[in-house]
């Protein structure tokens, strides 16, 4: 995978990148709203959207959010959202390479930990995260103004 590049998501790559998440989760993103909100998201230093490109094709996506803690040592921590690899490119270490990028970013910021949520039915994702050293904790999610997943 020498041709694999992990980089910050660019506006011109939005549709291709978001399509991976939408396809993996059988969703439809509101692109009009996304394009209107993108500059606000892109310019927020606490948001870091990345893509994995293989031969200039987007094959992975992740949103990394810096959270600023107010207790103990006041170290920041990261949350990872919207993580996904295109189904045709899984089991090729692309997700692992993306997480290596995330680890380097966390170390640069001197983060205390990284948190993420895997949907309860996403057994493949859970096994992948466990293979990277993550362990299960109890987490809760409340959807606001939406139907249950």
How would you label these PLM feature ranges?
Residues 82, 91-104, 131:
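Conserved acetyl-CoA-binding loop-helix of GNAT-fold acetyltransferases
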């Amino acid at each position: 995978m020498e041709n694999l590049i992990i980089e910050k998501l660019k506006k011109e790559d939005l549709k291709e990148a978001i399509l991976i998440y939408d396809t993996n989760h059988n969703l439809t993103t509101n692109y009009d709203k996304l394009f209107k909100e993108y500059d606000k998201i892109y310019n927020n230093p606490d948001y870091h959207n990345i893509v994995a490109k293989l031969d200039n094709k987007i094959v992975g996506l992740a949103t990394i959010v810096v959270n600023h803690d107010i207790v103990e040592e006041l170290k920041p921590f990261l949350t990872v959202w919207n993580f996904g690899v295109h189904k045709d490119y899984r089991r090729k270490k692309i997700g692992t390479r993306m997480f290596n990028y995330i680890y380097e970013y966390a170390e640069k910021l001197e983060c205390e930990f990284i948190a993420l949520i895997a949907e309860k039915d996403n057994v493949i994702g859970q096994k992948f995260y466990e293979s990277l050293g993550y362990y299960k904790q109890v987490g809760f999610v409340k959807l606001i103004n939406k139907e249950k997943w």
